[in-house]
Amino acid sequence: MDPLIQELTKEQIRDDIPAFRAGDTVTVHVRVVEGTHERIQLFEGVVIKKKGTGIGATYTVRKIASGVGVERTFPVNDPRVAKVEVKRHGRVRRAKLYYLRERHGKSARIAEARR
């Protein structure tokens, strides 16, 4: 990569995001601006994929809300994300957990890892 681009992106990369993988349950604290005031909205779910490296890296979190699956994709270096908490580490054998989209109930559970 060009040294100039590396220098510019180095300042934008966040180092306060904890290490997590696909299968981990995380809570993402998102800053939401409504009119003149700002609040924090929590989004808790299972990480079903991580994609990319550097400034363009993203991760997708899936949760079930009122019986409907909801997925949100967040950039790792997004300034709107206040913080990310890792609730539990899951034991999975895949990097992308797209198969969870077809699973319901107990078959959608992920075993806890012994880390």
UniProtKB/Swiss-Prot annotation:
SUPFAM superfamilies: Translation proteins SH3-like domain (SSF50104). One of its GO terms (biological process) is translation. Gene3D superfamilies: 2.30.30.790. Keywords: Ribonucleoprotein, Ribosomal protein. It holds the Pfam family Ribosomal_L19. GO terms for molecular function: structural constituent of ribosome. Disulfide bonds: none annotated. One of its GO terms (cellular component) is cytosolic large ribosomal subunit. It comes from the Bacteria. NCBIfam families: rplS_bact (TIGR01024). This protein is located at the 30S-50S ribosomal subunit interface and may play a role in the structure and function of the aminoacyl-tRNA binding site. Belongs to the bacterial ribosomal protein bL19 family. This is Large ribosomal subunit protein bL19. It comes from Lactobacillus acidophilus (strain ATCC 700396 / NCK56 / N2 / NCFM). The lineage of its organism: Bacteria, Bacillati, Bacillota, Bacilli, Lactobacillales. The gene is rplS.
